[in-house]
Swiss-Prot record:
This is Uroporphyrinogen decarboxylase. Its EC number is 4.1.1.37. It is an enzyme of class 4 (lyase). The keyword Lyase applies. It comes from Acinetobacter baylyi (strain ATCC 33305 / BD413 / ADP1). Substrate binds at residues 27-31, 77, 154, 209, 330. The record marks 77 as: Transition state stabilizer. InterPro entries: UROD/MetE-like_sf, Uroporphyrinogen_deCO2ase_HemE, Uroporphyrinogen_deCOase. One of its GO terms (biological process) is protoporphyrinogen IX biosynthetic process from glutamate. It catalyses: uroporphyrinogen III + 4 H(+) = coproporphyrinogen III + 4 CO2. GO terms for cellular component: cytosol. Catalyzes the decarboxylation of four acetate groups of uroporphyrinogen-III to yield coproporphyrinogen-III. GO terms for molecular function: uroporphyrinogen decarboxylase activity. The gene is hemE.
């Protein structure tokens, strides 16, 4: 086991003292970086970029060369599981992910093949192993998966959606079919994340990107219950170290209490939930991660610094000095000037000394 030179991200997830606030950015490896665009051009297309071990490793490491980040996150796609289940993932320019097949009936669910993460997504595991080795203990590596609900929306809709018409039609007219699909996906996600942990991931995040599109009762029934099942099925310790689990539901700030009850170590927040309110609600029971509006990075240096300091003031307003990781409230956008995230990251580290005494 390689000793970590910087473990403050993991310590913060476990609500242990840190010398400065750890920070990373969702989608930190992405199109806003010119070196990423160059590597993607070499790969030929996005899926080839994901499926080539050397390219996936390279783009994972790129933001760490620019910014003083406290964690790396595996570069992959959220839809690897549906692709491995034979739905035929492809991308059209300007239109996002699409599937050649959709899941609309009970028979469609029954026809899904068996799934084994280590064999069906071996390219992901190879990437995790390679990245872990390349990091050399510099910072921890985060593995991830989409939540069952989020994966199901893409599988039922056949791609991205603004209103989730087919998925919600299934939810209200054939709930048993949707539950059957979600159960299959929960089992697959458990296998997938455990395989990533075996390959070297030191923390994992479940991205429930579309959970916020659900009504209160439906969120519990069709999203949260399956994330709870996943958390219960995950390997929580490896090589004598706890493997923290982060849940992130975009638009889910109103569901903090039931999210805490899943057994996750941390909850990610988007920018619509005040951090000071969330900290008071969770009362030290879990760590919190977030939640700068990614659009803040369009602003001037002074504007970014002001927003970051306000976020940190909120995070530490209640006197707690543990259990907080700075991040964006959603993924960084492709239009951000690559010089701007450095202001965000450096301000987090420098200003948090005011509260952490480092």
């Amino acid at each position: 086991m390689t000793a970590l030179k910087n473990d403050r991200f993991l310590r913060a997830l476990l609500r242990e003292p840190v010398d400065t606030t750890p920070v990373w950015m969702m989608r930190q490896a992405g199109r806003y970086l010119p070196e990423y665009r160059e590597t993607r051009a070499q790969a030929g297309d996005f899926l080839s970029l994901c499926k080539n071990t050397e390219f996936a490793c390279e783009v994972t490491l790129q933001p760490l060369r620019r910014y003083d980040l406290d964690a790396a996150i595996l570069f992959s796609d959220i839809l690897t599981i549906p692709d491995a289940l034979g739905l035929g993932l492809y991308f059209e320019t300007g239109e996002g992910p699409k599937f050649k097949k959709t899941i609309r009936t009970e028979q469609d669910v029954l026809n899904l093949p068996n799934f084994n993460a280590k064999s069906d997504l071996d390219y992901v595991m190879n990437a995790v192993t390679t990245i872990h080795s390349a990091l050399g203990g510099q910072v921890p590596l985060i593995g991830f998966s989409g939540s069952p609900w989020t994966l199901a929306t893409y599988m039922v809709e056949g791609g991205s959606s603004k209103d989730f018409r087919y998925t919600k039609h299934m939810m209200y007219s054939q709930p048993e079919v949707l539950h059957a699909l979600l159960d299959r996906l929960a089992v697959a996600v458990i296998d997938y994340l455990n395989a990533q942990i075996d390959a070297g991931a030191q923390a994992v995040q479940i991205f429930d990107s579309w959970g916020g599109a659900l009504a209160h009762r439906e969120y519990t029934e069709f999203s949260l219950n399956y994330m709870r099942k996943i958390v219960a099925g995950l390997q929580r310790e490896k090589d004598g170290r706890r493997i923290p689990v982060i849940l992130f539901t975009k638009g889910g700030g109103q569901w903090l209490e039931p999210m805490i009850a899943t057994g996750a170590d941390a909850i990610g927040l988007d920018w619509t939930t005040p951090l000071n309110v969330a900290r008071k609600t969770v009362a030290g029971r879990v760590a919190l991660q977030g939640n700068l509006d990614p659009a803040v990075l369009y602003g001037s240096a002074a504007s970014i610094e002001k927003s970051v300091k306000a976020m940190l003031d909120d995070a530490y307003a209640n006197g707690e000095t543990t259990g907080y990781i700075a991040n964006l409230g959603h993924g960084i956008t492709q239009w951000v000037d690559p010089s701007q995230p450095k202001i965000f990251v450096d301000t987090v580290h420098e200003y948090s000394a005011k509260y952490l005494g480092s």
